[in-house]
UniProtKB/Swiss-Prot annotation:
<dbReference type="Pfam" id="PF02142">
    <property type="entry name" value="MGS"/>
</dbReference>
<dbReference type="GO" id="GO:0019242">
    <property type="term" value="P:methylglyoxal biosynthetic process"/>
</dbReference>
<dbReference type="GO" id="GO:0008929">
    <property type="term" value="F:methylglyoxal synthase activity"/>
</dbReference>
<dbReference type="InterPro" id="IPR011607">
    <property type="entry name" value="MGS-like_dom"/>
</dbReference>
<feature type="binding site">
    <location>
        <position position="12"/>
    </location>
    <ligand>
        <name>substrate</name>
    </ligand>
</feature>
<feature type="binding site">
    <location>
        <position position="92"/>
    </location>
    <ligand>
        <name>substrate</name>
    </ligand>
</feature>
<feature type="binding site">
    <location>
        <begin position="38"/>
        <end position="41"/>
    </location>
    <ligand>
        <name>substrate</name>
    </ligand>
</feature>
<feature type="binding site">
    <location>
        <begin position="59"/>
        <end position="60"/>
    </location>
    <ligand>
        <name>substrate</name>
    </ligand>
</feature>
<comment type="function">
    <text>Catalyzes the formation of methylglyoxal from dihydroxyacetone phosphate.</text>
</comment>
<dbReference type="InterPro" id="IPR018148">
    <property type="entry name" value="Methylglyoxal_synth_AS"/>
</dbReference>
<keyword id="KW-0456">Lyase</keyword>
<dbReference type="GO" id="GO:0005829">
    <property type="term" value="C:cytosol"/>
</dbReference>
<feature type="domain" description="MGS-like">
    <location>
        <begin position="1"/>
        <end position="125"/>
    </location>
</feature>
<dbReference type="InterPro" id="IPR004363">
    <property type="entry name" value="Methylgl_synth"/>
</dbReference>
<feature type="active site" description="Proton donor/acceptor">
    <location>
        <position position="65"/>
    </location>
</feature>
<feature type="binding site">
    <location>
        <position position="16"/>
    </location>
    <ligand>
        <name>substrate</name>
    </ligand>
</feature>
<dbReference type="InterPro" id="IPR036914">
    <property type="entry name" value="MGS-like_dom_sf"/>
</dbReference>
Amino acid sequence: MTQRLRIALIAHDQKKDDMVAFARAHEQALSRYDIVATGTTGGLIQDACPSLNIHRVKSGPLGGDQQIGAMIAEGTVEVLIFFIDPLSPLPHDVDVKALTRLGSVYDIPMALNRATAEKLVRALD
């Protein structure tokens, strides 16, 4: 049995609505993959897209970013879609840098904004 690709979905507070809209627009495509998301983002997506089975980890500031980073390092998350808000001060900026660094170290496809995420999901489909 082949394992399904696992995609991580994360969004900063000011980008959560955009992530929900993205997930809703691509619900059919995303349903073919295992989805992991940080707590609040995952809950919002699950409410908007009930057909998606989302594994929720802790909220980002409570360690969810690190949990997903560990999954990247273990090879159990193969794609990262992280809608970053570049205009808001990030109190957990170190966590963001650590997560995107791991995405680069382990050479996984990574989208940090909706335009790139749109292209990435179409390429996976």
